[in-house]
Amino acid sequence: MQYVIPAPRQAAIDVVGTDAKFPVRRIWCVGRNYADHAREMGHDPNREPPFFFAKPSDAIVPNNSTIAYPAQTKDLHHEIELVICIGKGGKNIPQDKALDYVFGYALGLDMTRRDLQSDAKKLQRPWEMGKSFDESCPITAVQPADKIGHPKAGAIWLKVNGEVKQKGDLNQQIWQIDEAIAYLSTFVALEPGDIIMIGTPAGVGPCKAGDTLEGHCDGVGDLKVTYRAA
């Protein structure tokens, strides 16, 4: 097929154990999927269930990258998250079959321009500019599910310059992996290459130019990204 302009670059993630890549189609995110994080953001998890939003696939940043501090913000926040990588497409997926649609798992950061997000919320406007910006999704290589299984519990944490800022356990998620997949598939058809960032534990906070962020999730991997000094 010929195009009238250069075709966009295909976003892709490394896969552990192979030179082949995981092509990324869409990035879905689950908001407020840990009760303690919902509360720190001023919301009642018993009254306001988690929800979905999206990032562009070209926001992905490879593990161990050094990147620029993003434009138009003075309050960049870290949110460490388990990432589900979809390997088979479907819609209205039954919850008891949902794990069959998973290719593997990774660890990612949903970087957030919190000031832009907060301002948009106050004005009742969409807050894509707070979430969907360049290099806002650092991510590890994918661990195939047929190698590691489906993580239901395990420590997940994030350090900034060696100091622990976020700490939780995967079993604290309000929606577990199968629930999130099944529910999202009632809104949109999931396709191979879609990824789902399934929420962050409490402790989100700011980082600045020159900071190094290190994340970990038991059984999934370790993530590191550095923001270039100003």
What positions do the PLM features span?
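Extended, compositionally biased flexible segments
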Residues: 1-97, 101-102
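Catalytic-pocket segment enriched in acidic/His residues
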Residues: 2-21, 33, 37-45, 114-230
